[in-house]
């Protein structure tokens, strides 16, 4: 098993909102934070904070970094790999 994938899966798993955001982006391709907040039921401040953390770990990609409003986010291939790992492990454990 890839150690980096395990570390990132742990990073996502310890904060359930991160997994909600990744799932939302995976299901919707490109979204702005307010759309993510609406779709997940999370507060916009929480979404913005978690997106920053997910971006630092290269799990999401900011398409228009020069914009202050209307920032477009997309899940990365690494983010999809982490989600697939978590979803597989969750199914095995249930």
Where are the model-predicted features located?
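Short alpha-helical segments that sit at the start of domains
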Residues: 1-20
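Pre-recognition alpha-helix immediately N-terminal to the DNA-recognition helix
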Residues: 19-23, 81
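Conserved segment of winged-helix/HTH DNA-binding domains
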Residues: 27, 72-94
């Amino acid at each position: 098993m890839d150690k980096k994938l395990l570390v990132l899966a742990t990073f996502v798993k310890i904060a359930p909102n991160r997994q909600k955001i990744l799932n939302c982006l995976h299901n919707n391709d490109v979204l702005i934070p307010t759309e993510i907040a609406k779709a997940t039921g999370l507060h916009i401040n929480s979404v913005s904070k978690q997106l920053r953390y997910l971006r630092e770990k290269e799990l999401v990609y900011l398409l228009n970094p020069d914009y202050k409003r209307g920032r477009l986010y997309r899940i990365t291939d690494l983010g999809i790999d982490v989600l697939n790992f978590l979803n597989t492990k969750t199914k095995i454990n249930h």
